[in-house]
C-alpha cells in the first residue's frame, strides 16, 4: 500500500466552539498553547496547563475512479479518547493516547470532497502523571491500494540465525499471486502466494546490526501493482543464564528513560527533534532508551535503527489500579490486547527494539490478580513475537508499601477531591493539594527521605515476597530502584535475569562494575536521560533566585530530572554517567553554582549534583567552589592557574570532589593511572570581562521545512558562556518560523510559543522551522545586546 502524508490542510478548535478553527500543521500539540493557571486540574502533573477537548477538521478528496480502492487512515498518536468521523459518521474510537491505530474508510467515503473530523479529549483532568500534550501530536497517513495488494504491516522480517546469516521474510497478501522480493546483496527472487509467502534468505558475509555498527538492509516487496519497502537489520537477541546476548555476545544495556515530549515543542513528534534527542543521548554514553511509560513513536524507532540505539518499548503506566482519576484504567481491560498488538506490529521489523515492557510501577504485581495478569500479558506478547524478551518495571519498595495500604488510589477519595476542586474553581480559588497515590506517592516519599532510604527500603523481606511471583512470570525482572537487592537476588534466584528498569543517577558506577561481574544483571535505565515537561520539580535542585516557591506551584513546568536539560545541554550528571558507564575515561570537570554555595535549594532524590562545566563565576572571588572531577583513573589532580590545589585517589568510584576558593582563570583536571602516568587532561577557562549576545546554530545548513536549533548565550568575546549573566531575550525570525523559545529552567512563567524568554545560567534556545531559503534569526536582550545569525538552506 502507498502512503500519503496528511500533515497540512487541518484546522483545530476547542470542541463546541462555533468560531472557525485555526489552521494547523501536524503533528500538533494543542495543549502547549493553553494557559497555565493555579486552577488547572492537572496541576503539578501537567505543569499547570489547562486541559480542553479539541476538534480537528480537513477534507479528503476522492476521485470517482478511486472510490473502490482501499483507503485506510493511520493515526500514529492522538491524545486521547480519539474519535474519527467521516462525513458525519463515527468511523473509529481509540481511547489510548499513545498507540497508532487504523481506520478503514471504505464504508464512509463518497466521490468528491469528504469531511474528516477528529475529536481529541483532554478536559478530563487529571489523566496523566506527566505532561501528555493533546490532539493529533503524531503524524497521520492515508494508505491506498487498488485491487489485490500487500496487507498493511504485511511484511514481517526476522533474523533466524547468524552463522550463516539467515533471514525470514513473511509477506501477507489479499489474494493469491506472485510475490517478488529484492534485498541488498542478493539476486531478485519470487514466490507464489496463497495469501502468505515465506522467503528464507541466506546473506553471506552479512553486515550485522549493533549499536556500534548499525548496518541496515533494504527489502523491496512487490505484488500485483503494489510495492512495499522495509529496512531491517541482521541481528539476533537471546537471553538466559549467560545474560542478554546480542548477536551471540553478551551485551550490557546502558540506557536512559525518556518521556515522549520534545521539550520546548511540547508533545509534537517532529522527526528532527526525535533525531536530535537520540543523537544527544548516544553522544552522552547511552546505548539504549526506555520509552517511558508508553509506546514510542515510529520516528524514534527509525532514528534508533539508523543511529544504533537499543529500545525497550513500554506499554503503560498502570493496569487496573488508577494513578490519576481519569487515566486509562477504565479502558485497559477491553483494549490491552489490541494495544499490545499494535505496539508489536509497529516494532517488529526494527532491529533497535530488543525488549518489551508491559508496564511501569504497576503495584498490581503484588496482588494475585496482577500476578496472573503479568503472565497473561507476557504470554500474549510471546504469541505475537517470541524473538524479544518481556519485562515490567516493578517498584520493589512501593509494591510492599501498597500491599500494606500506603499510597493506594481510592475512587471515593478521588471523587471528594474532585468535588472540592470544582467548588474552589467556582470561587476562583486554588484547590487544596491532592493526596498523592501510586508512583507519585513514591516520588514524594523519595523527595522527602532521599534515594538511600528508598533503596534500603527495597531490601526488606516483604519486598521480595510482594514481587517474586510476578517476576517469575516475565523473562527479565524489571527492578525500579532496587540496586541493593541485585547481589542477594541473583544468588537466591539462580535463573532470574535482572534489569535496572529505573535507577538513580548516582548508581551508574556501582551498576557498571557489578554488571561486568554478573552476566544475569543485563542492564540499567537511569531516570531520566533528558528533562521533560510535567511531573514538576521531581528532579530539581533549584534556588530561590530562579524559583519563587519550592512547593511545585504555578510557574513550575518541568521535572528537572534530565542528565541532559530541557534545551539539550548535557549537565555535569551526563559527564559523570559517560565516565561511569565507560563511554570514555574522562576526565571531566563540573562545578556547582559558586554564587549559591551553601544556599538552600528545592529537594529531590533524583538529582545527584547540579554541577555544570563552567569556571565563569564573576563576583565570586574567594568564595568556596565545590568542584567535581569525573574520571576512570587511579588518581586525579586539580590545578588552578598552574598551581595544584588538590589531589585525590579514586577507589571504587569515578567521582572526586574538591572544595577550593574560587579564583578566575584556568581550572584543569589531570588523571593518572596506577603507575602515576598521566592518562587524561581537561580544562575550564573563565570568561573575560566584556559581555555579548552570541547565537550558535547546531547545524550550519538545514533543509527547507526542517528544524534549526539555535542556542542564545551571554558570552565573552571568545564565546565562553557567562552563567551569571541574566536577562530577557526577544527573538525575531525572517525566512522561517519560530516554533519554540525558552530556557532549561524548570520554573518558567513564559510560554514556549512566545517570542521572548528569560535566560537560565546565561542561556536559552530558539527552535526555527526553515522556510524555502536562508533563515535569519535576530535576537535582542534588554536593549543592551543584540545579535543575528543566518542559517543557510541546504540543497
Go through the PLM ranges and name each one:
Residues 3-17, 30, 46, 51-151, ...:
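Accessory beta-strand-rich segments of carbohydrate-active enzymes
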Residues 5, 11-18, 78, 125, ...:
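Substrate-binding clefts and catalytic carboxylate motifs of secreted carbohydrate-active enzymes
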Residues 110-111, 170-239, 657, 661-664, ...:
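Extended acidic/polar, glycine-enriched regions
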Residues 164-191, 197-199, 625-644, 666-671, ...:
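Beta-strand-rich binding/interaction modules
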Residues 178-179, 212-216, 624-626, 632-634, ...:
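Short flexible loop/turn segments that cap and initiate beta-strands
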Residues 227-232, 676-688, 785-794:
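Edge beta-strands of extracellular beta-sandwich domains
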